[in-house]
A protein has these predicted regions:
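Bacterial Sec-dependent N-terminal signal peptides
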Residues: 1-21, 215
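Sec-dependent signal peptide cleavage junction
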Residues: 17-47
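Short hydrophobic/aromatic-rich motifs at helix boundaries and adjacent loops
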Residues: 28-31, 166-169, 184
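Aromatic-patch recognition
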Residues: 49-52, 56-178
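Compositionally biased P/S/T/G-rich terminal and signal peptide-adjacent segments
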Residues: 173, 177-191
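Long, compositionally biased interface segments
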Residues: 185-222
Length: 222
């Protein structure tokens, strides 16, 4: 396995080009890996980031099979980027997913996938040659309201998540219900019978991520 390369070796060099008169710093492209410096501000309540803190590290897998280690990282659901804190200040370095296959954080795998003509961040739970089971993340900006009954004096970022199945490259949003899962998978009557027997014998619940992974693993084996 190739050694992990520390991105911060060239992050430090790129930081030398900081423009103190602007909130956005100059972009760069290093070995096909692009990013931009910017000064993060929070003009609204809530956050566009997936994680509550910046304590996690990430292993970035490029399409060309190179790997990079990024420290103090978070995932920006609004910009569809992964961002790294350079110091304890609010300054961050923002990376696009261009040329990136996946990002691993705390043994979780994230991919940027096109859905409904826009890029969206997905956590991949299961994958084989035909099927992927994932959770998709999205953030929406809810405008402030002057109505005192609404109790929303400021704009607010609200994060949502949904489950998805990809079957033969067709990505579908689903609810964790057996009928909907079976329909999305396009199962034959024979496969449905086998899966029903498997569910009954193992007492798994299709409302749990880990049990759906077990079901799909079994389906791939028959």
């Amino acid at each position: 396995m190739k050694k992990l390369k520390l991105l911060f070796l060239f992050i430090s060099l790129a930081a030398l080009g900081q423009d103190n008169d602007s909130n956005v710093w100059s972009g760069f492209d290093t070995n096909g890996f692009s990013g931009v410096f910017y000064n993060r501000v929070t003009p609204v309540e809530g956050t566009t980031y997936l994680f509550d803190n910046w304590e996690q590290n990430a292993i970035v897998h490029k399409i060309l099979k190179d790997k990079f280690l990024v420290r103090r990282v978070n995932l920006n659901l609004n910009k569809m980027t992964f961002d790294a804190k350079i110091t304890e200040s609010e300054d961050v370095l923002s990376f696009s997913f261009k040329g990136v296959d996946k990002v691993e954080i705390n043994n979780r795998t994230f991919k940027n996938i096109l859905y409904n003509k826009s890029n969206r961040l997905f956590e991949v739970f299961y994958t084989d040659d035909n099927i992927k089971f994932m959770k998709g993340f999205e953030v929406k900006l809810i405008k402030a309201s002057k109505d005192p009954m609404v109790n929303r004096p400021f704009d607010q970022y609200v994060k949502t998540e949904s489950y998805y199945l990809m079957n033969k490259k067709v990505l579908s949003k689903i609810k964790l219900k057996k009928k909907e899962i079976y329909k999305t998978l396009g199962l034959s009557n024979e496969d449905i019978s086998k899966l029903n027997t498997f569910i009954k014998s193992t007492s798994i619940s299709l409302k749990k991520e880990k049990d759906i992974i077990k079901l799909l693993t079994y389906l791939n084996s028959i």
